[in-house]
Amino acid sequence: MSSLENKNIIVTGASGGIGNAIIKKLSEAGANILASGTRIEKLEELKKNFEGIKILKFDISQSDKIEEFIENATGELGGSLDGIINNAGITQDNLAIRMSLDEWQKVININLTSTFLMSKFAIKKMLKNKSGKIVNITSVVGHTGNLGQANYTASKAGIVAMSKSLATEYAKKNININCISPGFIKTAMTDKIDDKFKEVIISKIPSAR
């Protein structure tokens, strides 16, 4: 039996490419899944493809509504929460000297601040269970930096550091917090990246793809 069998798990950013793949694996493992994202048509598609999955449209930029979202999502899962995968995020690329304050703050707020708040309110639920797991999806560029992505790389590096702090705070409460830092993956989000930036990213990959 899978260790994820009947575990209640929230997945944000589920309407995107990586989120879709995460849902597939969790479903195969027998987890109870609440899929969240901004594109309802994609969420409805997930509901058709994966039996028993629950969906809830939510935009993580609404930071003042994240606590309510966690409450509602946990309720949809039967009242308890075993895990959350914080996968939602955005890019808004520009060279540093051209990057507006709004471009900087928007990416930091959505990627970093919202991930913190999702984790914070999920931990409150997990403390009641006396266990839980959080997986934060970051990026390899959060470790290496990248041309035209000062805001995005800072947000992802921040998630790594934040996750280490949260892991230290709650390890003795049987709550594990980890990060996964994927490389460049073709998704709807990365398709929006300027072709010149894509070339720079791909040139740093040994297999050049």
Question: Across the structure, where does each feature detected by a protein language model lie?
Answer:
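Alpha-helical segment proximal to the catalytic Tyr-Lys
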Residues: K124, T168-K172
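Residue(s) in the substrate-gating loop at a strand-loop-helix junction
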Residues: S139
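Substrate-binding pocket helix/loop in short-chain dehydrogenase/reductase
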Residues: L95-A96, E103-I108, T190, F197, ...
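Active-site loop immediately N-terminal to the catalytic Tyr-X3-Lys motif
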Residues: I97, T144-A150, K172-K173, A208
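Conserved glycine-rich cofactor-binding loop
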Residues: S15-G16
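The beta1-alpha1 cofactor-binding region of Rossmann-like NAD(H)/NADP(H)-dependent oxidoreductases
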Residues: F58-F69, L101
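Active-site helix of classical SDR
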Residues: S119, S155, S163
